[in-house]
Amino acid sequence: MIDADGNLVCPPIADPHVHLDAVLVAGLLTRKNQTGTLLEAIDIWGEWREHLTKDLLKTNARKVIDWYIANGVLRVRTHADCTDPTLLTVESLLELKEEVKDLIDLQVVAFPQNGIFTDPMNEKLLRKAIDMGVDAVGGAPHIEYTREDGVKDVELVYDLAEKYDRLVDIHIDETGDPHSRFVEVMAKESINRGMGERSAASHTTAMHNYDNDYAYKLIGNIAKAKMNMIANPFDNAVLQNRRDGYPRRRGITRVDEMSERGINVCIGHDSIMDPWYSMGKGSMLQAAFLLLHMGQLNGASQIQQLFDMITTNSAKTMCLSDYGIKEGNSADLIIYDAQTEEDVIRLQSECTHVIRKGRVICKTQPAKRDLLYSENKWVDFKL
């Protein structure tokens, strides 16, 4: 018996977008990301990938999974770079998925980091990754050499996902370039194939810089397609629009406008101590807190929406059927050291209990701050 003492009990947190193949390598890199840009990070990763071993990858990923569990995150979707000829990352993460299944539910996306049509081998590697058993097919159309190849990138992802009955999760328009408009192709494919609810568009940071008339039309098509949208505030806040000078545009997609149109928007952590982002500890509450500020989402109803973006919205994006506190579902839940969703985000509350399949797998004693200048007085920042 656990006494929650009036505190918030909710389903586990879900992270729909992370790269477990790259976590925790920031301190091992011989070359640092001096410009802080997405493109330099991709170059650094390409150099580092040649030195990556299965043991190191799985050791780092397991450590981050421990962090996730301590933060109440029990559903995770990871991308696996499938442009490495060895497919080491795909093989390692599929093995890890099986090894940690009693602790956490893991989905693996075949992600062509360097594009599909930038190298003759990349399409073959993507197809092989699908044969290996990944859960979703990914793409990166904005990385391709031309607009035409970018369109082909999206179309091939849908062809493969439809043929092999996989989910779709595409890194798309992850740039400040307002001319990068591949999510419109994704919306079209989702509508024509009826695959929107099984599709996720990750990043879409170029939407921030679109002409408003075009963005309004696009958001309508995304809503019609019933697509899922993933914002990644940690990386996008620091990687995008770095050449702007001042005033500097925010690198966050149009979360508020899409939410107002009823589109399912959720939040991903994306990177944890890697070439793209050297910070992070697997806390989705931190990601929600940052998006609250970067996306100007501090309205009363928006704060509740933020909590949904790391729970139910993320679960919907991941197409999870066994999610939520209801009869018949797996007994997975967490208890926070706060009574409301707003206070959980404000306080960045600890999970006092993390429960997996009816078993407590993590307990945390929240910090208590004793004020030594006054007898029997302490602070917990609660009202």
Across the structure, where does each feature detected by a protein language model lie?
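Histidine-rich, glycine-flanked metal-binding segment
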Residues: 1-10
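Histidine-centered catalytic micro-motifs
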Residues: 11-23, 167-176
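Active-site gating loops and adjacent loop-to-helix segments of metal-dependent hydrolytic enzymes
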Residues: 24-57, 133-136, 182-200, 223-228, ...
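Alpha-helical scaffold segments that flank or form the walls of functional sites
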Residues: 26-79, 87-99, 125-131
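Active-site mouth loops of central-metabolism enzymes
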Residues: 43-60, 109-120, 141-148
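Histidine/acidic residue-rich metal-binding segments in metalloenzymes
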Residues: 88-102, 119-228, 245-267, 323
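His/Asp/Glu-enriched, well-ordered alpha-helical/loop segment
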Residues: 167, 188-199, 235-239, 249-336
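Active-site microenvironment of metallo-dependent hydrolases
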Residues: 304-383
